[in-house]
């Protein structure tokens, strides 16, 4: 596998024991889902699920195991991002989990800045505070990296359509993260009136659900993964 070619997969914590050594060897990045925000801090509710991390590392020592925070219907992001203290609390608690369980970084899956999906809080200011939240998290990860002697990555999972692009300053965000994981499985679904393909090579120029829309807003293809 080329050093620049990355294959990532998400697994819910309760299913970590189903990830085989063969699976682990096929991946460069494994995202463990999900930590959540409670009272402004990032928590992982069932840490016993993480016992399999050492087994997967033994199977593939080069595998990056990344803690994913959020997911569909997970709130607390808008509130945490709104103030300096909130952003600091988010970043420090996230990195504390990285330190405690030996993760290789943090994945922020905020669904979605500026858009109230599944009833979670949102605000117009999320566009700017999303960048500030990532900046604080990046700084905290860098401090921890200096202490532990290894690079700790920061990635984000982003929506596949125009509303996410308009709700985030992607030209600024991309400079803070190692990877942008585009949720292309949301490009088509039962919420639309037209059928179509996920992650297809070519889209209609008027289609709001397309990778080229993200590229046009400043997201570098070298950081984008579908």
What residue spans do the PLM features occupy?
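Hydrophobic faces of well-ordered beta-strands that scaffold small-molecule active sites
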Residues: 7-9, 30-32, 65-69, 106-108, ...
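Structural recognition of alpha->loop->beta junctions
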Residues: 22-28, 32, 86-110, 168-186
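Short secondary-structure junction motifs
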Residues: 62, 103, 149-151
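Glycan-recognition patch characteristic of GH18 chitinases/ENGases
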Residues: 1-98, 115, 125, 136
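Surface-exposed acidic, glycine-flexible loop patches that form ligand/cofactor-binding
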Residues: 19-23, 56-59, 99-100, 143-148, ...
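Compositionally biased, intrinsically disordered low-complexity regions
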Residues: 11, 72-73, 107, 198, ...
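Substrate-binding surface in catalytic domains of secreted glycosidases
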Residues: 39-48, 113-226
């Amino acid at each position: 596998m080329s050093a620049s070619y990355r294959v990532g997969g998400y697994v819910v914590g309760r299913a970590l024991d189903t990830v085989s050594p063969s699976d682990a060897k096929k991946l460069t990045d494994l995202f463990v889902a999900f930590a959540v925000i409670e009272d402004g801090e990032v928590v992982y509710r069932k840490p016993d699920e993480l016992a399999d991390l050492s087994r997967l590392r033994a199977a593939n020592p080069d595998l990056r195991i990344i803690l994913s925070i959020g997911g569909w219907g997970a709130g607390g992001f808008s509130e945490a991002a709104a103030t300096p203290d909130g952003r600091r609390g988010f970043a420090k608690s996230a990195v504390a989990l990285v330190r405690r369980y030996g993760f290789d970084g943090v994945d922020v899956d905020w669904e979605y800045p500026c858009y109230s999906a599944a009833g979670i809080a949102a605000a117009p200011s999320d566009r700017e505070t999303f960048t500030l939240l990532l900046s604080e998290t990046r700084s905290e990860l860098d401090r921890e990296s200096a202490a532990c002697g290894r690079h700790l990555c920061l990635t984000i999972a982003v929506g596949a359509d125009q509303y996410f692009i308009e709700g985030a300053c992607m030209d600024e965000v991309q400079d803070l993260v190692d990877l942008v994981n585009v949720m292309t499985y949301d490009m088509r679904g039962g919420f639309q009136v037209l059928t179509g393909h996920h992650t297809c090579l070519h889209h209609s120029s008027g289609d709001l659900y397309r990778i080229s829309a993200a590229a046009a807003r400043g997201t570098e293809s070298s950081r984008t993964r579908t």
